[in-house]
Amino acid sequence: DIRARFAGKYQYQTGSDCEVILSLYREMRADSDFDTLIYKGEDALHARISKMLEELNGIFAFALYDAERDEFLIARDPIGVIPLYIGYDKDGKVLVASELKALEGQCDHYEPFLPGHYYYSKNPGMKRYYTRDWFEYAAMQKKYQIDDAKKAETQLKDAEPQEKAAVKEIHDALEASVKRQLMSDVPYGVLLSGGLDSSVISAVAEKYSSTRVEN
């Protein structure tokens, strides 16, 4: 938990989970070599910003302005649950909003802010920070390709234990995911579609929730 990690170092003014973003940003900027990364090249700077954003395990879309340095950082979570749009006016100014209508008439060009991306004013342009090997089918195919008959035979023998392990992994991952979302500082509920998935999520939420889960 980010708040607990920095509790003795930063004085949090609110109970909002959004405030932890400031802690992560300050830690990133406190690195003695961060300013030099801007001049060392895009790869080093990108890696450091990506490292910070990877620590945010949840739903988010934010624009952080650093008044001391006159720079900003905009980012959106990997799934893109919260809407976010970015636009540019004729003078090259960057505008960002959670509703498209806020940018209409203000920009020469606007577009959705891509999920899993960030925009840092010192290195303009949307850049992907969230990357996984399963993004590409070819990469996964190569990773799990059966090389020979012996390996295939071994896998058949181990199929049942592996299946049981996979079921447990899915169970544990689902519970951990739902439990993590229950850390929200605002009221939450479950939208029931009548299917199995929403029912399972509701059951897990009820198991770990300290308050009544609304539907």
Where are these regions (language model features)?
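Cysteine-centered catalytic environments shared across enzyme families
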Residues: 1-215
